From Swiss-Prot:
InterPro entries for the chain: ATP-dep_Prtase_HsIV_su (IPR022281), Ntn_hydrolases_N (IPR029055), Proteasome_sua/b (IPR001353), Proteasome_suB-type (IPR023333)
Positions annotated to bind Na(+): 162, 165, 168
MF (Gene Ontology): metal ion binding; threonine-type endopeptidase activity
Protein name: ATP-dependent protease subunit HslV
Length: 178
């Protein structure tokens, strides 16, 4: 059976604000199965934002594990992400998971990759998923040439990705932290 795939998740940080957004499309092969999925969430009492791309079941499995790590490390995003990455690399079942996460709190944005890497993106911009390159390019241009708020940059970047990537729609969920 084919895997569910395709989405765009993008995060932008400027000053004391961070925004994380994603589209709502879930695709199975060349069929849109759902257009209103919620791939961006607030976790850890609303203090951490997380967005996921990749296989839906795998992403939920990772999200559950990440939430447990946040609890274990009392909300320390970096320690939770690194510990999740260690598990991801060393556990046979986890190594097979096909998903990626972007996580953000008030101070830090991290990308947790399908290889178990934890990346701190440059320039306050991170994007993943099938439309990630489009969204990241758009966000970078907007951040360098406008004074738009992070939420507005995320919305415009997702709109552009939705126009270019067939696996991305324009039903957005955008969350912010200040």
């Amino acid at each position: 059976m084919e895997q569910y795939h395709g989405t765009t998740i993008v995060s932008v940080r400027r000053g004391n604000q961070v925004a994380l957004g994603g589209d709502g499309q879930v695709t199975l092969g060349n069929i849109v199965m759902k257009g209103t999925a919620r791939k961006v969430r607030r976790i850890y009492n609303g203090k951490v934002l997380v967005g996921f791309a990749g296989s839906t079941a795998d992403a939920f499995s990772l999200l559950d594990r990440f939430e447990a790590k946040l609890e274990k490390y009392q909300g320390n995003l970096t320690r939770a992400a690194v510990d999740l990455a260690k598990d991801w690399r060393s556990d046979r079942a986890l190594r097979r998971l096909e998903a990626m996460l972007i996580t953000a709190d008030r101070d830090t944005t991290l990308v947790i990759t399908g290889n178990g890497d934890v990346l701190d993106p440059e320039g306050g911009i991170a994007a993943i998923g099938s439309g990630g390159a489009y969204a990241q390019s758009a966000a970078k241009a907007l951040m360098e040439n406008t004074e738009m708020a992070p939420k507005d940059v995320v919305e415009k970047a997702l709109t552009i990705a939705g126009e270019l990537c067939i696996y991305t729609n324009t039903n957005f969920v955008i969350e912010t932290l200040e």
